[in-house]
Regions:
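Long amphipathic N-terminal alpha/beta scaffold segment
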Residues: 104-115, 121, 126-133, 139, ...
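Cationic, low-complexity basic patches in intrinsically disordered or flexible, solvent-exposed regions
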Residues: 8
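Conserved non-cysteine loop/helix-boundary elements of the Radical SAM core domain that shape
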Residues: 78, 86-94, 122-135, 149-213, ...
């Protein structure tokens, strides 16, 4: 992952300013991403926009290294507008904690610093009501060794309530929002079944910037 920061570009020994370099400058240490699954689906898979998904996305929503979080019962309750019980919220938090433990175990031998980024990588990480996402994201950033929260999502799945939550969490620990631009060319976007025009992506970036939220752009080279 390339992190473009022209302010520090000349100070870097590499040909580009890497994420590793950015993490060391920002947090003073190396950190590893732990791939997590919030249990969400995607509008490009559940029939809202399409059922086939983007052509580059894997069967697990490209969250291949994350343990699957099966909380459909609780997710359906929030989509019906029901209030989650304390037991529901506790179940969500415990599921995330279990994923964090498993994720840390996978990289602990090579991660001497013991610092991590909680990365909700699978499917669309904000494609759920705030009442469902809040206990999940809060549990992810609770451990001291978690330096930041990173959420992969679509630009058409960032309503004001979601942005309010992310902005609130950003006051506790840095929040990054990873958006799949993939291409700026309409014909290619249609071919890969991205499911939204470039204008939607641009508008989402503007709204995230206005909230002080860091944006990571996913692009396909070639």
């Amino acid at each position: 992952l390339i992190c473009w920061d022209f302010q520090h570009r000349k100070e870097c020994k590499m040909e580009y300013y890497s994420l590793n370099e950015y993490l060391r400058r920002t947090f003073g240490t190396k950190a590893y991403k732990i791939s997590l699954d919030a249990g969400c689906s995607c509008p490009n898979r559940d029939g809202l926009l399409d059922t086939r998904g983007c052509i580059f996305c894997s069967a697990s929503g490209s969250g291949d290294f994350a343990e699957h979080l099966d909380m459909q019962r609780i997710l359906k309750k929030t989509k019906r507008g029901e209030i989650l019980t304390e037991a529901d919220q506790r179940a969500l938090r415990q599921a995330v904690q279990k994923q964090l433990i498993a994720g840390k175990a996978r990289v602990e031998k090579k991660n001497k610093a013991g610092k991590y980024i909680a990365y909700f990588q699978a499917y669309t990480g904000t494609y759920a009501p705030v009442s469902y996402l809040r206990p999940i994201f809060e549990a992810a950033i609770e451990p001291e060794e978690i330096l930041a929260l990173s959420v992969a999502t679509r630009p058409d799945c960032l309503d004001d309530e979601i942005l309010d939550l992310l902005e609130e969490l950003n006051q506790k620990k840095p929040v990054w929002v990873e958006l799949g631009l993939q291409t700026i060319h309409p014909a290619t976007a249609e071919y890969i079944r991205r499911g939204y025009p470039l204008s939607v992506y641009d508008a989402a970036v503007d709204r995230l910037n206005a909230r002080g939220l860091e944006v990571i752009v996913h692009v396909i080279l070639g």
